[in-house]
């Protein structure tokens, strides 16, 4: 659908856009192999199997928080960790980024709800 394609392209632009005080992009952590934060391996969304494994396991129960969380919440928290401006819940930007990630995870089987640290 043309609107979905437009959303994907905006999400892709956002995924690679660098900004904030650390000049990070989503791709800084999720666009290459071998990235980790503390003990957590980070998925490379440029590889379908990585994207599928990551995207299809949300919503998830976050043990550290004792709560179910959505992919959109995960993006909000990632933006916070990057010191980026707050990504508004249900904003067009958040929907575009989720659309991009969902397309990258195409053909993955849902494996939710999952349990995350």
Where are the model-predicted features located?
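Short, charged low-complexity linear segments at domain edges
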Residues: 1-12
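Electron-transfer interface patches adjacent to heme c in soluble/periplasmic c-type cytochromes
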Residues: 4, 16-117
């Amino acid at each position: 659908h043309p609107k979905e394609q437009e959303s994907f392209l905006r999400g892709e632009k956002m995924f690679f856009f660098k900004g904030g005080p650390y000049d990070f992009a989503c791709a800084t952590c999720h666009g290459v192999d071998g990235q980790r934060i503390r003990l957590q391996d980070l998925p490379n969304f440029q590889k379908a199997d990585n994207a599928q494994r990551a995207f299809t396991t949300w919503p998830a129960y976050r043990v550290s928080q004792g709560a179910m969380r959505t992919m959109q919440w995960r993006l909000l928290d990632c933006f916070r960790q990057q010191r980026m401006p707050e990504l508004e819940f249900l904003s067009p930007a958040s929907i575009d980024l989720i659309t991009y990630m969902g397309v990258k995870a195409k053909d993955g089987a849902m494996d939710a709800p999952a349990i995350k640290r």
